[in-house]
């Protein structure tokens, strides 16, 4: 089975997908900024370019099916796929659908939902599947002591894992910064995923004071991170909730 991912140029997926071993092509698309209407003036041009490029990609790759999860790039790609007679499936990760999936609902052959009772889609197309999760993460978690050693931390101390999501969480980051000394004073360690935007700033502000702290912008090996944690504090993204519900660790 050959898989080609389509993402939005300049977004995180353009870096992360190749690192996971898959091909990806980018579309020059962005979301609509409801808080700054002037920033949306270029959206029609970006959409037009993305539709044209999506059409070209589909003709070259010739997929048997096109699957979208509601991101920026899903719109142009799935719209063109449906026009070319390629079966379209959309997957809605949240309890309330986003704008892209709502616009595509009539062009999809099937709509896979994470939660029951979503009324915004045609009932005859809806399949209650739950969210897809990486099951290998939860099978036989690594040895806690070895996992903590891999982060350069002390297995004798309690360890918190902080997950800010793919983009990071500024709210979480600011909370940890303000109370970091308290953690260090009571001997609690922190594996801190900051996200890319805040990583350099936080590292500079800490100025080498990293006793009992492992700081990283992104975590690729979630199995080891979960294994090391005594407590997990996480941003409540749709996929995060689905996966963390199976970890079996105390969770905030």
Please name every model-derived segment.
Residues 2, 12, 23, 82-145, ...:
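Active-site-proximal region of nucleotide-activated glycan assembly enzymes
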Residues 2-46, 196-198:
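Conserved nucleotide-sugar phosphate-binding/catalytic loop shared by glycosyltransferases and other
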Residues 11-15, 63-84:
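An aromatic- and histidine-rich active-site surface loop
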Residues 15-19, 102-104, 117-126, 201-209, ...:
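Short loop/helix-cap segments at secondary-structure boundaries that form the rim of catalytic
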Residues 20, 142-149, 153-231, 241:
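Donor-nucleotide binding loops and adjacent catalytic segments primarily
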Residues 36-65:
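An amphipathic, basic-hydrophobic alpha-helix
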Residues 60-62, 106-107, 221-228, 246:
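Alpha-helix C-terminal capping/helix-to-coil transition sites in glycosyltransferase folds
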Residues 84, 227-229, 243-251:
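Conserved donor-binding/catalytic loop of nucleotide-activated donor transferases
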